[in-house]
Amino acid sequence: MKNSIISYPRIGANRELKFAIEKYFKNQSSKEELLKSAKDLRIRHWQEIQKAGIDFIPSNDFSLYDNVLDAAVLFNIVHTKYKNLNLDALDEYFAQSRGYQGENGDVTALAMKKWFNTNYHYLVPECDNADIIALTGDKIFKEYLEAKELGIESKPVLIGIFTLFKLIAFKDEKTQKLAKEKLLNAYIELFDKLNELKVTWLELDEPYLVYDLSKEDIALFEEFYQELLNHKKDLKILLQSYFGDLRDIYPKLLESKFDALGLDFIEGKQSLALIQKYGFAKDKILFAGLINGKNIYANDYAKSLKLIKELQKYTQNIVLNTSCSLLHVPYSTEFESKLDSSYLKLFAFAKEKLQELKDLKEILNSSEENPLFRANQELFKNIPERLDEKVKARLKALKKEDFTRTPSFKERALIQKEFLKLPLLPTTTIGSFPQSTDVRSNRLAFKQEKISAQNYTEFNQQKIKECIQIQEEIGLDVLVHGEFERNDMVEYFGENLKGFLFTQNGWVQSYGTRCVKPPVIWGDVSRTKPITLAWSKFAQSLSQKIVKGMLTGPVTILNWSFPREDISLKESTEQIALAIRDEVLDLENAGIKIIQIDEAALREKLPLRKSDWHSEYLDWAIPAFNLVHSGVKAKTQIHTHMCYSEFGDILKEIDAMDADVISFEASRSNLSLLDTLKAIRFKTEVGPGVYDIHSPRVPSVEELSLTIEKILNKLPKEQIWINPDCGLKTRAYEEVIASLKNLVTATQKIREQL
């Protein structure tokens, strides 16, 4: 019995990669220094995985920004606008990631989307010229040879041709048709080069196979691989899937020329049933994904061994594997000195999951009952308390009307128009303002008890004053307090709710250099005291203009935390919804007229198969949001915000959230959502983000005016709000002020024309 992992976190034990790249962005280090830091990390990770006794060690899973972009660059799928900048390869790569504004030109970044049902974001490759598609990159070969120098025969990992093709945004059908042929030739050349290097195994990741596949999808997959697998020669190919099961294509895969199939037994609801129904091919190896790559709880060896025993009825050729990349979990529990051992023993981050794979291999390869098995089973005895009877009773007492807001949207809109007295095309921001070093230092000093609560509060109040003043000077219509007290929109609420646990160093990559530290939902959730009330009241006292109350919604708190596995996601979400509802009502009672409840991650846990959307998710996720705001008066305006997902196919459900205003990311996706909003007669007022805050470039007044005009061509002027596409926390003040001034100027200019 051997073991394997799909891929490993690349940010490093202490986010070394993030800091190395950011230094390069700030011109504080050279290209050579950045590449050396990256190589050092790769070597450290390979040695760590090797030391843990993993048999199939991945290479090419490392990335300076995003592995989808890496695959696109490998095959020269780079839009002409980036080629025309005439930058070197590294800076062209980062121009695609972040946009570019300088002496060589001014271009926006590639669109960013959620990676399937995770909180990782990938960059959408753009292809406007298929003629240039070819194997021009060498990253996959270089990194294989780096590992080889360490004495490691690695398994290069690459996004498969079918998934990559499905993720690319093509200019038109003609380009797409040519790209199909060119990309196939490029993959064939890749196979040839890997054969020249005498590579043993290549892992091709095809997560797109876990979606609902059409006949056309299956035909395309077969067309690609019937040709491609004829060119594998001595190279062994592992087809790796994750985030679901392969029900639409599994029987065909058994007949294919793949040497191994990687199946997910955590999220793949039908993976075991498919094997029980169709068996497994004698000429293939089963890479069994039984270590959860998306959650942090320790593996129960009894359950894993039971699964292996069942699988062995159908094949003896089994490799123990992770269910998906370990990118989605933190690096190691080694760095958690503050978390009580009664909790910590039940957690397994990436490094600990390597140990779990090693243990399981050893247990399966030994004849008598192994002490490793007994030690694992001991973990699950005497678990700390999780239940709160008051929370259970409150959930039980909920009635149908608790999930419905009255009066109707139409009636509320008239009442709010009279009450709020906002101009046409009201301008606002999404919530957070830049967090400078002194803001972070103040928060850290307070956490470490180096300053008093009074000093901490006074510092933040001064920052709020400055933030309100800046917004008033710019001329925004609806203000925010800036969120200087918050480290992260989910972690902050978790810290102030009962039922959550926190790590010191549990960082996970969200995109590029952005890392998040998800809280852990351990027990029943409740609010013991107001969370944002004092900050919102203080901010509102500073201005005659409306200052929004800012909250994070229950679905996002759930989706951006590591969830419990002992109760349903529905129950966890409703517990959080009741806690946030209490906060909403406190804000309203304090005179806060607009309350924003962000649901940035609404789409994240939406099942990948449409047949499961409602029964497994939307039927409880949308009502949970309704529960949060259903108790407010008609005159109180409820906003929500969503970002970096595809919403076109769930807009009716989003409308059913019954918010009064929704803002969403639209700038990177070229406002393509607006046509759908128009088509379904979306009732909610909308703020399609008019510029991309994830890029350092400052949009001009002309550019913003054109964007606003585009929006006005699609939607009624009474329905539109003008705002950036996301919070401004990660940007510098000079970029923010310049961009917002241009936003207000452009809006005023357009108002004069209406």
Curated annotation (Swiss-Prot):
Active site residues of this protein: H694
Gene3D superfamilies noted in UniProt: 3.20.20.210
Enzyme class: transferase
Annotated binding of L-methionine, by residue: I430, G431, S432, E483, D598
One MF term in the entry's GO annotations: 5-methyltetrahydropteroyltriglutamate-homocysteine S-methyltransferase activity
Membrane-crossing residue ranges in chain numbering: none
Residues the entry annotates as binding 5-methyltetrahydropteroyltri-L-glutamate: R15, E16, L17, K18, K114, R514, C515, W560, E604
CDD domains: CIMS_C_terminal_like, CIMS_N_terminal_like
EC code: 2.1.1.14
InterPro entries: Cbl-indep_Met_Synth_N (IPR013215), Cobalamin-indep_Met_synthase (IPR006276), Met_Synth_C/arc (IPR002629), UROD/MetE-like_sf (IPR038071)
Metabolic or biological pathway: Amino-acid biosynthesis; L-methionine biosynthesis via de novo pathway; L-methionine from L-homocysteine (MetE route): step 1/1
Cofactor(s) of this protein: Zn(2+)
Cofactor stoichiometry and binding remark: Binds 1 zinc ion per subunit.
Pfam families reported for this sequence: Meth_synt_1, Meth_synt_2
Entry keywords, A to Z: Amino-acid biosynthesis, Metal-binding, Methionine biosynthesis, Methyltransferase, Repeat, Transferase, Zinc
Binding site residues for L-homocysteine: I430, G431, S432, E483, D598
Binding site for Zn(2+): H641, C643, E665, C726
Catalyzed reactions: 5-methyltetrahydropteroyltri-L-glutamate + L-homocysteine = tetrahydropteroyltri-L-glutamate + L-methionine
Record-linked HAMAP family: Meth_synth
Task performed by this protein: Catalyzes the transfer of a methyl group from 5-methyltetrahydrofolate to homocysteine resulting in methionine formation.
NCBIfam families, per database record: met_syn_B12ind, PRK05222.1
Name of this chain's protein: 5-methyltetrahydropteroyltriglutamate--homocysteine methyltransferase
Organism: Campylobacter jejuni subsp. jejuni serotype O:23/36 (strain 81-176)
Gene: metE
